[in-house]
Amino acid sequence: NKIPYPRHKNFSIDDARELAKWRLPRLVFDIVDGASGNEFLSINNNKAYENIKLEPRVLINVEERSLKTKFLDTEYGLPFGFAPMGMCNLTWPNADTMLAKEAIDNNIPICSSMAASTSLEKIYELSNGLAWFQLYIGQDEDFVVDLLNRAQDCGYKTIILTVDVPILARRSRDNRNGFDIPFRMSIKNFIDFATHPN
């Protein structure tokens, strides 16, 4: 199942961002688009991407070319994969499932987030074994051991140890929108969701 949106309006990442801003409830858009604190790190990351320069190589034979990459003794179709993303299904029903299918179609890894909307077992099954598992340190030791056992039992071979969030960060947009876990629906959120039914 392909996502039914007007692809002809998406010519760039900025176009896709604007479409998401229009279609998604503000709370959901801000969860995806926002960052912690004053968002300077996110802004600086985007500036760093803008500074990447590609060097063209001309007058060489490009008849046989490939983006295949070998990493951790596995050959992948592209030199990148899907990063761990929590709560994907907030943005679109079964988004985790669609990402797993795309991973299979493109032979790329998908990293199952500890905050995924879909269980780590289901993501592994849906990805035909292309899934990696994200592990945050700092959780209760019994909880972490249980997660690792579950990941091992269903076949995960790669664990991505995530150390960038030693404590939960303050996210201003989420605070302004009243987003917290567990989520409690406010009148403002209800109206926002009702006016963005997609």
Regions found by a protein language model. Give the residues of each.
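A short, Lys/Arg-enriched amphipathic alpha-helix followed by its capping loop at the start of a domain
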Residues: L78-F80, L99-I108
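Conserved, mostly hydrophobic/aromatic
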Residues: P25, F82, A103, L161
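Active-site-adjacent beta->alpha loops and helix N-cap segments on the catalytic face
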Residues: T91-D96, S112-L130, I137-D146, P166-F179
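Hydrophobic faces of well-ordered beta-strands that scaffold small-molecule active sites
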Residues: F80-A83, I110-S112, A131-L135, I159
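Phosphate/diphosphate-binding glycine-rich loops and adjacent basic-rich segments that engage nucleotide
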Residues: K157-N198
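An N-cap/entry alpha-helix motif that binds or orients negatively charged groups
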Residues: N1-L72, P182-N198
